[in-house]
Amino acid sequence: MSKTKTKPARLIVAASDSDADMLYATKFWAPDPFIFLERNGKRTLVLSDLEIDRGRKQADADEFVMFSELEREVQGKSKKAPPYEKVLAHFLRKRGVKSTIVPANFPLRYAEELAANKIRVRATNGFFWPEREAKSNKEIEMMSHALRITEAGLKRAVEILKRSKPGAGKRLRWSGKTLTSEMLRAEIDSAILRAGGIPTGTIVAGGDQGCDPHERGFGPLYANTLIILDVFPRDAKTGYFGDMTRTVLRGRASAAQRKLWETVKAGQALALKKIKAGVDGMTIHKAIQELFAERGFPTELRKGRRVGFFHGTGHGLGLEIHEDPRLQKVTLKDRQVLTVEPGLYYPGVGGARQEDVVVVTKRGCKILSRFPKQLEL
């Protein structure tokens, strides 16, 4: 009689505050690494004395083990506490684990210790939990809430910009002071916190600063200048991210600024019409580039600097701000949640980007973002 092949155990060692796979598995927030083991359908957590009682109340698991008990077993009569990886290997040996599947970011020293104990370690390529790619109705609901938090930040930014007035040198003034990127970012982040979110790297980039897509922005903001507002907070309760970008201008736009902004808006509208399960994302990306070039905005090198549309069209969104897939590198699938964020960047005119979040469907896509697009404030 042939023996039944035992499936490898699924193993994560990470802090769920910063590791999406661990948070997805356990629904439990913790700032320090702990052990997750799934074997034969049973989920076990190894937690510190500090966290185990809270874990029993909050975490999605079948069994809870105290790390300190395992540590004492390994330490024996030694006066020195054993390294974490020794305790991990001991725990797996006690459970009879011979083979494991781990995330791609599994710590090397842990993998080496397990290998030394004849425990096979195989890293995944892509999602550790494949089901993370197609979002459930509950996840879509949670991400919609994260977008409402995002919109609270954008709303505050627009309110302040509308109240600001141009001063000397066209510097915007608000509340008796020169309005800076730092001040506006602080106001956006405060609104996010009040709405139940965690700010993460909010971008307020005016003028040519906006031509570097990940420049956070610094210094005074000016009238009649394009300002990129890219807001991507995390819901403090669920861990899911929102992500939206609007490009605005306080004052009057020049013909060149308006053309840039309108072209980006048209590029995003084109993408939204083409998104559908089964479509090659690269065809969408190329269609946007072609539209931009036809309207006089080629992507090229000028004086050693990239101009035009030189980043991706969008990315997956969920428990990570950037997760698989990259829109332009895959065939789209039903229930993927993606950002759609074309942009154009030309020093001297400025940068413009519009970003919304969609759910891919078999018939097209559903837009989850609600915040309006308005150039002049």
Per-range role (PLM):
Residues 1-377:
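Active-site neighborhoods and metal-handling regions in enzymes and metal-associated proteins
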